Regions:
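Hydrophobic "lid/gating" helix adjacent to the active-site nucleophile
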Residues: 7-52
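A generic structural motif
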Residues: 8-9, 67-72, 177-182
Length: 206
């Protein structure tokens, strides 16, 4: 993954997110859906914690809306669009504003929290996050931890959660969906690795 990100001038997160977009595109195409020009909006957390506080417990992030270019057929162009969107979002104040709104909601009455969260959730189809895990094996009571995985929390009417985790040199892609919208998430998951391999092949050919 780092080979692709360095060669193409983007982040590891951009590469993994573009691979997820490719997997969604492939799935929808096999269903016969019209995806010409289609974008899916995902809520993505952006870390706002300063580096000097990296080891402190707790969360310190803002939420931004990322448009996933499902309709883009070219894998390289798809990655470029994801990377450009992420750069623009990181340079904007959207994450800081989102953090402030979430903090204010947390201090407000419960009767306002639910409708407010529902309003935010209507603006997105999915929530997606990539968590960089430890790149060396962990041990618990002397036993090696073979794999790690997490499931991104969802709220309101959002029907898809995209989870990406790196651990001990491997990348794990998970998907949690509303069965009424995506009854077979495994069909999307199995497309993730081939989509990444397309980007890797493009990188090696250049």
């Amino acid at each position: 993954v780092r080979t692709v990100s360095r060669a193409l001038g983007c982040t590891v997160n951009d590469v993994l997110m573009a691979s997820a977009v490719g997997a969604l595109r492939s799935y929808l195409m096999d269903l016969g859906e019209d995806i010409e020009g289609l974008t899916i909006r995902a809520t993505v957390p952006v870390n706002l914690r300063p580096l000097e506080h990296a080891k402190k417990l707790g969360n310190h992030f803002g939420l931004v809306y990322l448009d996933l270019p499902i309709g883009e057929a070219n894998p390289l162009r798809r990655l470029e669009r994801v990377a450009q969107s992420m750069r623009e979002l990181k340079q904007s104040r959207q994450a800081i504003v989102g953090f402030g709104l979430l903090a204010a909601l947390g201090m407000g009455p419960a009767m306002l929290q639910r409708p407010a969260l529902e309003m935010f959730s209507r603006k997105a189809t999915a929530v997606a996050t990539n968590v960089p895990g430890p790149q060396m094996p962990l041990y618990l009571a002397g036993a090696r931890v073979a794999d790690l995985m997490f499931w991104v929390p969802q709220n309101g009417s959002i029907g898809m959660g995209i989870s990406i985790l790196s651990y001990d040199g491997n990348v794990h892609f998970g998907l949690m969906t509303d069965a009424r919208r995506v009854p077979d998430p495994g069909e999307i998951i199995k497309r993730f690795a081939p989509e990444f391999e397309k980007l890797l092949l493009i990188t090696l050919m250049e």
